Every structure is written in structure tokens, then in C-alpha cells.
A protein has these predicted regions:
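Helical hairpin unit composed of two closely spaced alpha helices linked by a short loop
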Residues: 73-79, 94-97
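The conserved cystathionine-beta-synthase
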Residues: 38-64, 69-71, 88, 108-136, ...
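Bateman (tandem CBS) regulatory domains
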Residues: 24-37, 46-47, 93-107
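Structured interaction and signal-relay segments at domain junctions
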Residues: 81-90
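Nucleotide phosphate-binding site architecture
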Residues: 8, 29, 85-86, 150
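Membrane-interfacial segments at transmembrane helix termini in multi-pass membrane proteins
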Residues: 1-42, 157-187, 192
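Short hydrophobic beta-strand motif reused across regulatory alpha/beta modules
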Residues: 76-82, 141-150
């Protein structure tokens, strides 16, 4: 792996071109993971608390899993841990998740069919560095963070990151191995390559 990230101007240019080509060709869907849980809207805040406690032993990421809310099989919103902080414990059994949910549209999202370069830009604009991935019908299918994007790019380069390094990247919410993906996309934008790519995708 270290050999791929060599030194020298020609080596650096070829690496950048390889990254750019992958960011254009790879799509969000296959790169996504599923960093969200699901609760029904009529479940109590106690259920949310218990869910967090059960996951405390293995959730070591900088950003905990999102909690999406359903009603009768329909996605209707999401809920944060803020109600657990704002309300006394005795109210957790009286109030439901649905009473404190927020619109699903508030979460930054991207379609499965979008190219990865769009994900790189969207992640920079998102508050927490995570995106909700949606299918053609606009329904949630997964999530995407920087480590997901980085892992997909490394696979495209036929490089496999050791699990401990990938987990460390996920905990920090950054690109594994310091992949300069934002710089690659910025260069593509400056050269006008993204305009040409967008036109070819819509034609």
C-alpha cells in the first residue's frame, strides 16, 4: 500500500488522476454502510435510552448511529438524544419518540446513484460529516461517511486497508490513510471536469 503512495511529480499526478477517475465512476450506493437504527414513533423515550445503552459497548465512533423513526412501515423522521438530556428520567416513560422527532428532510442526503465526488463535497458541507443515502423512491437505504468513501476508493485501487486502520478512521470520521479526496475534487472542479461529467450524466 505504501508503494502506491509514492513520491515525485509524475507519480503524484498519476495518483491524482486515478483518484479522480474513481470518484467519477464509483457510485454512492455500493459505498454506503448502515449507521442508523430504527424506532417506531409510538415507542417511549425510555426505548431510545435503552437502545443507546445497549450500543455503548461497541459504538466508539465520533458520531453515534442516527435513529430514524417509522410509523406503520413509513419513514417519517428522526430523533436525536437531546430529549434525554432535556427531560427528567421520570418523563421518559410518558413521552414518545414521535413527540420529539425531526423531519427526515433535515438530514443531509444523497441518492444511491450519485457519483462519489458529489459525496465528497456533500460531506464537507454537512454538519457532522455523515449523509443519509436514499434509493430511487427517496427512501433511506443507508448512510455514508468519509471512511466509507475512502474504503470504496481504496478497493477501486485494489488496496485493502487493515481493519484496525479502517476503524480508527471511522472513529475520527476522516478519510483513511489521509486520502486527498477533497483536493482531488477541488482540482476537478477548477479544471471544469465536473461540469463535463454532470452534462454527460444528464444527457
Amino acid at each position: 500500500m505504501l508503494g502506491w503512495f509514492g513520491v515525485g511529480a509524475s507519480r503524484s499526478q498519476s495518483q491524482t488522476l486515478a483518484l479522480q477517475q474513481l470518484l467519477i465512476n464509483l457510485q454512492v450506493g455500493p459505498a454506503s454502510s448502515k449507521r442508523f437504527r430504527v424506532l417506531e414513533s409510538d415507542q417511549t423515550l425510555r426505548s431510545l435510552s435503552q437502545m443507546r445503552l445497549r450500543g455503548a459497548d461497541y459504538e466508539t465512533d465520533l458520531l453515534p448511529d442516527w435513529v430514524l423513526v417509522c410509523r406503520s412501515g413509513r419513514w417519517i423522521g428522526y430523533v436525536t438524544d437531546q430529549p434525554l438530556k432535556d427531560l427528567a428520567v421520570q418523563y421518559w416513560d410518558r413521552q414518545t419518540v414521535g413527540e420529539h422527532m425531526r423531519p427526515l428532510a433535515d438530514l443531509p442526503s444523497l441518492q444511491e446513484s450519485a457519483p462519489l465526488w458529489k459525496a465528497v463535497l456533500a460531506l464537507e458541507q454537512s454538519e457532522h460529516g455523515r449523509l443519509l443515502v436514499t434509493g430511487a423512491a427517496g427512501l433511506p437505504s443507508g448512510t455514508l461517511d468519509r471512511s466509507d468513501v475512502g474504503e470504496a476508493v481504496l478497493k477501486g485501487l485494489s488496496l485493502k486497508l487493515p481493519p484496525p486502520l479502517l476503524e480508527a478512521s471511522r472513529r475520527r470520521n476522516d478519510y483513511p490513510f489521509g486520502l486527498p479526496l477533497l483536493q482531488a475534487v477541488t482540482s476537478m472542479r477548477a479544471s471544469g471536469l465536473l461540469d463535463e461529467t454532470s452534462e454527460s450524466l444528464t444527457s
